[in-house]
Each structure stands twice: as C-alpha cells, then as structure tokens.
A protein has these predicted regions:
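Small/aliphatic-rich secondary-structure junction motif
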Residues: 1-47
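Alpha-helix N-cap and loop-to-helix initiation/capping positions
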Residues: 8, 49-57, 123-130
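Short, solvent-exposed amphipathic alpha-helices that sit
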Residues: 19, 53-65, 88
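Solvent-exposed polar/charged
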Residues: 22-25, 91-95, 140
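General small-molecule cofactor/ligand-binding pocket signal
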Residues: 32-34, 77-81, 147
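Acidic, proline/glycine-rich short linear motifs
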Residues: 35-60, 154
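Structural beta-alpha unit
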Residues: 70-112, 120, 155
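Gly/Ser-rich helix-loop-strand patches that form or flank binding pockets
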Residues: 99-155
Length: 155
C-alpha cells in the first residue's frame, strides 16, 4: 500500500500523520510525504532572503519527519515541490498513483512555526478562497481515494 501524505509541518499535519499511522501502520505502507513551498509574490531582496530562510527551515523539518518515519520502519519517499499546492499535489497523485491521499484539514488556529505564521497572515485575508480549497480541489480531482483528517482545536 502506498499512502501519499500532504505534509506542511503544521500542528494539524503532524497530528493527522500520527492518526494515519495509527490507522494504517500495521500494513507497513510506503509513505510518500509531499510538501509544497508556495512561491513568494514579493520580489524585494529582504523578502527573498526571508523566503529562502523559511524554505530551508521547512525543507529541514520535512526531512526530519521523514527520517523519524524511516526509523520507525516505514519506507519513505519525500517530494518537495514549489508553487500552487493544489496543482503540485494533484500532479504527484497522477504520476505516482498512490492508494490513498491524506490531507490534514486546515485550522483556524495559528500555527507556531515560521511557515505557519507567515501563511496564517495571508490566509486570513483570503480565507473565503483558501478555507478547504486544497482539500476541496483534491477531493474532486484526485484519481485515488482522499482522506481528509479533522484535527482537534487543542492538542
């Protein structure tokens, strides 16, 4: 079994990953962690350096999660894409044909990490567009079953 997990290192993603492994871990599935860095729209040099720093921290966090899963005995593949998360994940689903795609539902609670804080500020402005937009888009278009994990408000 191959499970593709859309991972953004948020509190909800970590919780959903744990729950997914609780549900499917005994099957020893291949876990494909797909993480997407959204490209910065601001082209100033300070913004670029902040973006690159945040991207590096995000990439490191994703790889550390993959390493931890590997230590638990799971076969892991990591894909780190850049761009529109919906399109990057959909293309990966179409190319890799996983048995299941897992997504953590977006939270209204701000996340503590750098990426989460940056994204949270933008999301509030475009909440009508972004609330569930990735989940909704992939649930309609993915060529495999999609599991959208609900997460508690407080862990």
């Amino acid at each position: 079994m191959n499970i593709m997990f859309a991972y953004d290192d948020s509190r909800n993603a970590r919780f959903a990953l744990k729950r997914t492994l609780d549900m499917f871990g005994k099957l020893q599935p291949m876990i494909i962690l797909i993480a997407v860095v959204e490209q910065s729209l601001d082209t100033s040099s300070s913004s670029e350096s902040n973006y690159l720093e945040a991207k590096e921290k995000f990439t490191t966090a994703v790889r550390e999660t993959a390493e931890s899963l590997g230590e638990q005995g799971f076969d892991i593949e990591v894909i780190i894409g850049e761009g529109d998360a919906r399109k990057v994940i959909l293309k990966a689903v179409q190319n890799l044909n996983p048995d299941l795609l897992v997504i953590a539902r977006r939270s209204h609670e701000p996340d503590g990490n750098v990426i989460g804080q940056s994204i949270d500020a933008l999301v509030e402005e475009f909440n009508f567009m972004t609330f569930g937009s990735v989940s909704s888009f992939l649930a309609r278009r993915a060529t495999c079953p999609v599991l959208i994990q609900a997460c508690p408000a407080v862990l």
